[in-house]
Structure formats: structure tokens, C-alpha cells
């Protein structure tokens, strides 16, 4: 069976991404490539980001250790109201036409927050859930280390994005954006869990745009990620993205589209696959009190702001409420 498939099991085209080399001493050259990618599609590769392949391989081995646990152990860590912890397989129909199902499971972490933090129980923020140390020795330390390293890469990308938008290079690394990293979160994904017939079913995740600024996606060598560059088109054309060893795939999210007044485009994407697959996404988000409004370099009299001004926390809350409502509506 082909590596890259439509949701109906048909072969599809491959979209070739721009590649941003973070070791390039000429940040303006990198910024020009990034700007082109973000205007044309909203997705690109990042290489020479500072994380070794050995570290990435070990991190993916750690993901597998958790997902290999008995479901009874994983369910003891089922995600809380702050969306930290284990998200069990949905196993729900995600496409009414094809009757395809989502058999993925995930684990969600963020920056560790103590129980006595005044904001510890805010939506999408709060203490993490961890498996007992005697069950998975060293697992928490490995996951916290990965989250920290991925956030460091995000800061490097943020500098290139700033230059691409004619802003001060440090704009996105200020504390309320990427700098403090308080609102960033990392999700680990396992596709093709128990119950999926991988020789028959092509299973995946619902098409969506990420709500945050941008996402760092790392995958194993199994194909699965697909994009639609014309997200508002009536007839959507899907293209496969090749997994590249040692590279991050970076998705533009809706918040960055809003900040740039639509100059940078968030990318509609999904996962469709026919083999067991692992991936991880680190979602870069401003602090919840940050006001999302059009950047001064992205508006003019001829191009007034297109999006409403909104506090980040309220935007996240609204988006998840919409998602919950659409899910309930679909099941009904």
C-alpha cells in the first residue's frame, strides 16, 4: 500500500516544503524564505535546530514506553479539566462520508505549575499529571527535558519570524509571547491503537488549523501528515508532507494569522495513515493575558485589521467551546 493516501485510500501528490536552516548566519535570507512559505502555505521545515538525532530517537522511545502501558494504567492519568494528562482513543467516526475513525491516543504536558499557584486551575494551565516514577523511571524528566528543548527551538524560529515581519528580532521572545514559555504545551500522539485494522482502515485526525502561534511537529519515519493549502475552498485538495529525519515541520497557527492580518496563513491539516505511527507537537502560545491584535507592520489604510482584538486566554476558551459543541453536534 502507498505511503501517502487520501482518506479513501487513494494515492495523492506530495507538497515540497521550504526548508529553513537555523544555522544560517544570514537571518534575513532565512526570513525571506520563511515569509514566502508562510504566505504561500503556512508550513515549512526547520533543520539544524540544535537538537541531536540521538536525543530525538531517545525521546520517541520514551513516548512508546508510555503508550505501551496497559490501558488501565494510562486511564489513571486521564486528562483533567486543564487538558493535562492522557487522552484515550476516541474511536469515533470523524468523516460522515467515508466512515473513517480516529483511533489515536495522546498525552499532554506543559510547564509544571504548583498546586498553590494562583492561576493553577485556569483553563489550559495547571499542574501536569505524571505516571508514578516506579512505573516509568526517568519518564517525567525525559518529557520535561524535551518540552524545554523544543521551546528553545521555538525561540530561534520566533526571531526569524520577527525579521520576516519587519519587527525587532526579539519581538516574539518577549516574556508575554514565547519568552516565558508559560502557555506552551507539548502533546505526544500514537496513531493506530488497539481496534484499528491497519490493513483495511485509513485512520486519522479531523482536519483542523492549530489555534496557537505556531507548532513544532516531529514525527517518526511513517507518512501521515497531509495539508490543504486552500482551506476555504469548496472542493479541498489534499497533499502529503514527507517526514524528514532530523527536521521539524512547523505549522502556522490561527493566532499568527490574526497577528499578521492574514499575511501569514494558518494551514489546514490532518493525519491519514495505514501504519502505526508516533509524533509530537509543541504548541507555541502567548501567555493568556496577551492581547491578540494586528501587528503594526501588517496593517495600513489600504489594509485595515481584519480580525477582532482578543485576550489569548479568552480566544483559547472560545475555540475549545466551539470544538466541544461541534463534536457533540456531530455525535448527535
UniProtKB/Swiss-Prot annotation:
The keyword Metal-binding applies. It comes from the Eukaryota. Its cofactor is Fe(2+). Fe cation binds at residues 208, 210, 269. Keywords: Iron, Metal-binding, Oxidoreductase. It is an enzyme of class 1 (oxidoreductase). Residues 181-286 form the Fe2OG dioxygenase domain. Signal peptide: none annotated. Binds 1 Fe(2+) ion per subunit. Pathway: Secondary metabolite biosynthesis; terpenoid biosynthesis. GO terms for biological process: biosynthetic process. It catalyses: (1S,3bR,4R,5aR,9aR,9bR,11aS)-1-(1-hydroxy-4-oxobutan-2-yl)-3b,6,6,9a,11a-pentamethyl-7-oxo-1H,2H,3bH,4H,5H,5aH,6H,7H,9aH,9bH,10H,11H,11aH-cyclopenta[a]phenanthren-4-yl acetate + 2-oxoglutarate + O2 = azadirone + succinate + CO2 + 2 H2O. 2-oxoglutarate binds at residue 277. Its EC number is 1.14.11.-. 2-oxoglutarate-Fe(II) type oxidoreductase involved in the biosynthesis of limonoids triterpene natural products such as azadirachtin, an antifeedant widely used as bioinsecticide, and possessing many medicinal applications including anti-tumoral, anti-malarial, anti-rheumatic, antibacterial, anti-inflammatory, anti-pyretic and diuretic effects. Catalyzes the formation of azadirone. Belongs to the iron/ascorbate-dependent oxidoreductase family. This is Azadirone synthase LFS.
Amino acid at each position: 500500500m502507498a505511503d501517502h493516501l487520501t482518506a479513501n485510500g487513494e494515492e495523492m501528490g506530495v507538497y515540497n516544503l521550504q526548508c529553513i536552516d537555523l544555522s544560517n548566519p544570514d537571518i534575513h535570507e532565512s526570513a525571506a524564505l520563511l515569509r514566502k512559505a508562510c504566505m504561500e502555505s503556512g508550513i515549512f521545515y526547520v533543520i539544524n535546530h540544535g537538537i541531536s538525532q540521538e536525543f530525538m530517537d531517545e525521546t520517541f522511545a520514551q513516548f512508546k514506553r508510555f503508550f505501551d502501558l496497559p490501558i488501565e494504567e494510562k486511564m489513571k492519568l486521564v486528562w483533567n479539566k486543564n487538558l493535562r494528562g492522557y487522552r484515550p482513543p476516541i474511536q469515533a467516526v470523524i468523516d460522515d462520508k467515508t466512515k473513517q475513525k480516529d483511533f489515536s491516543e495522546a498525552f499532554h504536558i506543559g510547564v509544571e505549575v504548583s498546586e498553590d499557584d494562583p492561576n493553577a486551575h485556569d483553563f489550559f494551565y495547571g499542574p501536569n499529571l505524571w505516571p508514578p516514577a516506579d512505573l516509568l523511571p526517568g519518564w517525567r524528566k525525559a518529557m520535561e527535558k524535551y518540552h524545554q528543548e523544543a521551546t528553545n527551538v521555538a525561540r530561534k524560529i520566533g526571531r526569524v519570524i520577527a525579521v520576516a515581519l519587519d519587527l525587532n528580532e526579539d519581538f516574539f521572545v518577549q516574556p508575554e509571547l514565547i519568552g516565558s514559555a508559560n502557555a506552551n504545551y507539548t502533546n505526544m500522539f500514537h496513531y493506530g491503537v488497539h481496534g484499528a485494522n491497519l490493513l483495511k482502515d485509513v485512520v486519522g485526525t479531523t482536519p483542523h488549523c492549530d489555534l496557537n502561534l505556531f507548532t513544532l511537529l516531529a514525527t517518526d519515519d511513517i507518512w501521515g501528515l497531509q495539508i490543504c493549502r486552500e482551506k476555504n475552498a469548496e472542493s479541498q485538495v489534499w497533499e502529503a508532507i514527507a517526514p524528514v529525519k532530523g527536521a521539524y515541520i512547523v505549522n502556522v497557527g490561527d493566532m499568527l494569522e490574526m497577528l499578521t492580518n492574514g499575511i501569514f496563513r494558518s494551514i489546514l491539516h490532518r493525519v491519514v495513515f495505514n501504519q502505526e505511527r508516533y509524533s509530537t507537537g509543541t504548541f507555541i502560545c502567548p501567555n493568556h493575558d496577551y492581547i491578540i491584535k494586528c501587528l503594526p507592520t501588517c496593517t495600513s489604510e489600504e489594509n485595515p485589521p481584519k480580525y477582532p482584538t482578543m485576550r489569548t486566554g479568552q480566544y483559547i476558551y472560545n475555540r475549545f467551546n466551539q470544538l466541544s459543541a461541534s463534536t457533540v453536534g456531530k455525535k448527535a
